[in-house]
């Protein structure tokens, strides 16, 4: 199944390092980041999981839950946690899905649906496409997905930046420009005509082009 932005994130029930999880129930009324890993005890993924734990407070204050996924058993994944603590100085407190039968990886289009067997005997290279980040909104829709090569670690400060943009643009009729960071100027959406913009933004705006109007961050 091909997944696109604004599709409903497929629901599933799966085992994890914190027991059985129903994904939609687990998300609740907040946001979620699901990020996947091809195999336990792989070097790049170990640094990523540790970094997400270090950023736990940043995700929490944005009402965002994080959940990992690895194509392994619960025991294998659980045995990885101490290694992550040694490597990154932080042991993951968030759940990691043990996708033993690869069902979630297939459901989320990270592995071919016709792929047979279980995680047993598979290597990280067999699962190299299981390197995707999904951001899911309170409406359970996919807001973003990014797939990374095995040799490139993910930038979770960038994930937080994207979440800040989504939180702002979901509550104000604006968009965020290139390299935007929280607190910087934003762009009035082109669909908002000048007459409506005058009511929404009575302090006015800076016109770069008729289709590019900038205002201060309206959340400040």
Language-model region placement:
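Chalcogenol-based redox active-site neighborhoods
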Residues: 1-220
